[in-house]
Amino acid sequence: MNPNQKIITIGSICMVVGIISLMLQIGNIISVWVSHIIQTWHPNQPEPCNQSINFYTEQAAASVTLAGNSSLCPISGWAIYSKDNSIRIGSKGDVFVIREPFISCSHLECRTFFLTQGALLNDKHSNGTVKDRSPYRTLMSCPVGEAPSPYNSRFESVAWSASACHDGISWLTIGISGPDNGAVAVLKYNGIITDTIKSWRNNILRTQESECACVNGSCFTVMTDGPSNEQASYKIFKIEKGRVVKSVELNAPNYHYEECSCYPDAGEITCVCRDNWHGSNRPWVSFNQNLEYQIGYICSGVFGDSPRPNDGTGSCGPVSLNGAYGVKGFSFKYGNGVWIGRTKSTSSRSGFEMIWDPNGWTETDSSFSLKQDIIAITDWSGYSGSFIQHPELTGLNCMRPCFWVELIRGRPKEKTIWTSGSSISFCGVNSDTVGWSWPDGADLPFTIDK
């Protein structure tokens, strides 16, 4: 085949391929056009696939008013409820540096509230967190029993002193911040600022560091303003939906109230507090919903504060021996009897025990009938406080008494650059319990301390 014949042959093949391609394209266009005509003339023809529409309705959790009218449940001992192990976990995890943890429950859940230092454990910003009051401290909360971290915690308020409680509808939080000579308490209801309380003595306005108490839609808290080592001023506040509706200043000469642990009982409120001035036994105040109040000291010779003397003869006024300084604590009143929570050490914040004194609310002897170990004297404890589980949460027909214990680690007792704590909690039951030691258990110092 000569060159001209090759050119003619190749050209013919290309022309045939082109014609075939053109015919295929024309066929494709005709097919699409016919399909469109069929759909146009049969508009009611069912779709080839089934389409389903899902409708979602958001259901709000039911709200109730926590009545608080029930009496405390009868109990024979204390069952462990939670332990967060936050210092142990914080050696390798992102855990907040905290102090002053406390627990409060709604009708649906219990949460741990705590005052952060704006820092994480084992981090440079944990240096110097032994300080109580700073602009970096905030009130946050997380589910009870969980280590407080940036991933499970909810911001509540800017605060270096705080309280919180649930009325059955929303959370009330009280956060105090600002300078010592002019701090302000910011009240929030459902996360929204609803009221404020200005320091009235311009001397470190402070509140409970544990839950406030709610009865029939009203919540109650106690605040202190004035010296920590002599006569100060104390007020009870009645709060409804986040707004102060009434307050009364206690007429309490020679009394000293700080960091009260309050709970509802049969429609009234009982608060057991810290005397940082001159009492090694604990002062109390009880009041009704109109803020008509009574005051006193726990009479028992089983003393509840630390430091304190050895148990002996008590007083229904302040017991002055070793009465200066103190630690936040609690007790539960049962008629003339009292459950007393206290450190095991008479001089330091170490160990913890629960003691039942069947006549200790009104009598001054030091006899008691039950003691349950919580923390060994060789392990650190710290603040402690009460909280209540309402019948709307438990399904019981009574108020379940519970308490938490702060387990302080770090400065000033240990060689670290930081101060923080974990917590444990117990609830009262009328069944079998056991005494043991549930310490913090962290191995110090951390890497940042070396």
Swiss-Prot record:
In this protein, the active site sits at D132, Y383
State the GO CC annotations.
host cell plasma membrane; membrane; virion membrane
Cite the post-translational modification comment.
Answer: N-glycosylated.
- Could you say which residues bind Ca(2+) here? D275, G279, D305
Q: What else is known?
A: The influenza A genome consist of 8 RNA segments. Genetic variation of hemagglutinin and/or neuraminidase genes results in the emergence of new influenza strains. The mechanism of variation can be the result of point mutations or the result of genetic reassortment between segments of two different strains.
Subunit description: Homotetramer.
Comment on protein domains: Intact N-terminus is essential for virion morphogenesis. Possesses two apical sorting signals, one in the ectodomain, which is likely to be a glycan, and the other in the transmembrane domain. The transmembrane domain also plays a role in lipid raft association.
Q: What is this protein called?
A: Neuraminidase
Organism placement in taxonomy? Viruses, Riboviria, Orthornavirae, Negarnaviricota, Polyploviricotina
